[in-house]
Each structure stands twice: as C-alpha cells, then as structure tokens.
Amino acid sequence: MAKSPETEHPNKVFGWGARDKSGVLSPFHFSRRDNGENDVTVKILFCGVCHTDLHTIKNDWGYSYYPVVPGHEIVGIATKVGKNVTKFKEGDRVGVGVISGSCQSCESCDQDLENYCPQMSFTYNAIGSDGTKNYGGYSENIVVDQRFVLRFPENLPSDSGAPLLCAGITVYSPMKYYGMTEAGKHLGVAGLGGLGHVAVKIGKAFGLKVTVISSSSTKAEEAINHLGADSFLVTTDPQKMKAAIGTMDYIIDTISAVHALYPLLGLLKVNGKLIALGLPEKPLELPMFPLVLGRKMVGGSDVGGMKETQEMLDFCAKHNITADIELIKMDEINTAMERLAKSDVRYRFVIDVANSLSPP
C-alpha cells in the first residue's frame, strides 16, 4: 500500500493544499525528506502567490497531481545544511524559485539553463529527485538541493522581494537573452499585472524608454507616476495605436488571455522583437505578413536558470527593484485566489507564512 503524504517521509510538515480541481485550499498535513548531504532545509517566511498557482490548483492545464501544495516564490531562513553544502550556512536568508531539480548532465544544464532540462523538477506538483512528490511553499518549511537555493541579497526585502523569484526572472531572462537591454531603446510592455509591472521597473533600470500597452486606460496614471513608465498606450484607441506604429524596438507580451498579435506586431520597428511570456488557454493567430515584411521576430521564454536567477536578484537589489505587493495571511488565500482570477490585485499577493501559518 502506498504511503500517505503524512507518512511518506520522517519529518511532519503543515501547510495548505488543494485536494481537487475545485481549487479550494485548506489545512494539509504532509511530510518532507530528511535533510540530505547536499540539501538545505528552509524555514519559510514569505511565499508569493503566482498565477501558475491558481492554474495548478484548478487543473486548468490538465496536469495537476493532487493533493497540491502550491508556492514557488519562497523566501526563508536556512535552518539545516548538509555536510556537502558549501554555498550556505544555517541562518542565511535564502530563496527558492520555480525549479528544484534537474539532471545536471544534459546540454541545457551544462549551459546553466536548468529550466529547460528535460528532467527538470518543479518546486511543486512534480516528482522530485528522490522519486517522491514535491510540495511547495504554502507550508512551514522545504528541503531543497543546494544547487537550487538562491542567496537573497541583504538589502532586498523578504516580502516584496519574494515575487522576483518567478515574476522577476520571467521578465529578466528574455530581456537578457534577446538583447533587450540597450539604453535608449524603446520597450513596450503589454499587460500590466504581476509580470508587467516588474518588467517596467527592470526596463527602466536598463535605461530603456518604456511604454505600457493596455486595453484599460484606468492604469495610465499608475503606470507613469508610480511605476515609472514613460508613456501609456491604450489599445482600444485607434488614433493612438496608429500613431504608435513602427515606434518600438521590443515588446514583452505578458498577457495571459487570448488576444490579437497583429496590433502588437504593427507597433514594432523593422527588426523588432515580440517576446511572449503569457500562456493563453487557446492558441493565438500569428500573421506572417508583418513578420516577413518587417523582418520581425516572435519568441518566447520560460523563467531562467539558477545562475541567471541569482544575477537577477543581485540586479534588483542594486537598483532597488521589488514587486508591489499585498501581504495576506495564510487563511486568506482562498479569497486571494478569487481576486487573482479577476485580476483584482496590485500587483502580487504574498503570504506572511511565518506569522500566520499555524496547525488547526
């Protein structure tokens, strides 16, 4: 007989998990492995709430493996380190992001692109290197191989810094890879949510001119006066869209809803790049004419490897970049998920795990 989540490993842990596609989260007792020779045990202080968490607890993508304990934007304190651990010591403040394992021997891993490893393990809703299920950061603690633990910079706040472990690297990695970092160039950010608002801040830190592209004019003042964008373009205004044709060098498309790509491609200059980060539930139509006639590129990107994620954290610390957050208690998570589904958050929920998670 298979062991239950609570008896599978020797160390009892408490968290909140979803049992089925209703997505309702409730108190959940499970267990974690002993701290191994290469492991770091992390007492979780804060955990960001990512849109992926919402998709996963509701099985929107069809691969949820219940019960699910979500959470991959984790900041905490190292409480145990294995004898082979050289990067961390007890008491260090650390982060754990989207991935917690990879094969370490494939071409992607050799290039510090563990996030593209065919055997990559997600921090939750996946099978770990020991053959048992991974549970995420909506919990007391987590045990992770040191290679997938990040040093959290001293001047980066634990709460508002937590979302950088997913949202931050998701926008930083494509900007670096696709060469979207040349000061003075014009970056469009399509969608002003959890990813988009961080993209604005990182773009400005690279010295880019940043325009937020949105269907909602109500976000204009906040985008410019609060987040620091240079301009705001409303996609429902035909005159302004026409005037903006051919003005942008790059566009980061963070929109997760089904939307038209043709208008965005029209905003790009010759040789412009449109990089998609959102994951709409249905395929998008990709028109060929603007690509061919303007020698334009459409690409994608998925988080980043460990080396680049550490680089991103250090960059954000240097430039005082954090996420705009709403701090919540653990027992407020279901309400937060309902609001997240309606895009009713500015711009990321973060759970105060250490001060609000307690067994019933």
From Swiss-Prot:
Pathway(s) served: Aromatic compound metabolism; phenylpropanoid biosynthesis
Keyword NADP in record: yes
Cofactor: Zn(2+)
Residues binding Zn(2+) 1: C50, H72, E73, C166
Positions bound to Zn(2+) 2: C103, C106, C109, C117
GO biological process terms held by the UniProt record: lignin biosynthetic process
Listed transmembrane segments: none
EC number: 1.1.1.195
Annotated signal peptide: none
Catalyzed chemical reaction(s): (E)-cinnamyl alcohol + NADP(+) = (E)-cinnamaldehyde + NADPH + H(+)
Entry GO MF terms: cinnamyl-alcohol dehydrogenase activity; zinc ion binding
CDD domains xrefs: CAD1
InterPro entries according to UniProt: ADH-like_C, ADH-like_N, ADH_Zn_CS, CAD-like, GroES-like_sf, NAD(P)-bd_dom_sf, PKS_ER
Tissue specificity note: Expressed in the vasculature of the primary root and elongation regions. Expressed in the hypocotyl, cotyledon veins, vasculature of the first rosette leaves, and hydathodes. In stems, expressed in the vascular cambium, interfascicular cambium, developing xylem, and phloem. Expressed in the entire floral organs at late developing stage, and in the abscission, style and stigmatic regions of siliques and seed funicules.
GO cellular component: apoplast; cytosol; plasma membrane
Keywords for the protein's UniProt record, in alphabetical order: Lignin biosynthesis, Metal-binding, NADP, Oxidoreductase, Zinc
Manner of cofactor binding, per the entry note: Binds 2 Zn(2+) ions per subunit.
Superkingdom classification of source: Eukaryota
Database matches in Gene3D superfamilies: Medium-chain alcohol dehydrogenases, catalytic domain, NAD(P)-binding Rossmann-like Domain
Binding site for NADP(+): 52, 170, 191-196, 214-219, 254, 278, 301-303
SUPFAM superfamilies: GroES-like, NAD(P)-binding Rossmann-fold domains
Assembly notes: Homodimer.
Function: Involved in lignin biosynthesis. May catalyze the final step specific for the production of lignin monomers, like coniferyl alcohol, sinapyl alcohol and 4-coumaryl alcohol.
Family classification: Belongs to the zinc-containing alcohol dehydrogenase family.
PANTHER family reported for this sequence: ALDEHYDE REDUCTASE
Protein's name in the database: Probable cinnamyl alcohol dehydrogenase 9
Species in which this protein is naturally found: Arabidopsis thaliana
Organism lineage string: Eukaryota, Viridiplantae, Streptophyta, Embryophyta, Tracheophyta
Name of the coding gene: CAD9
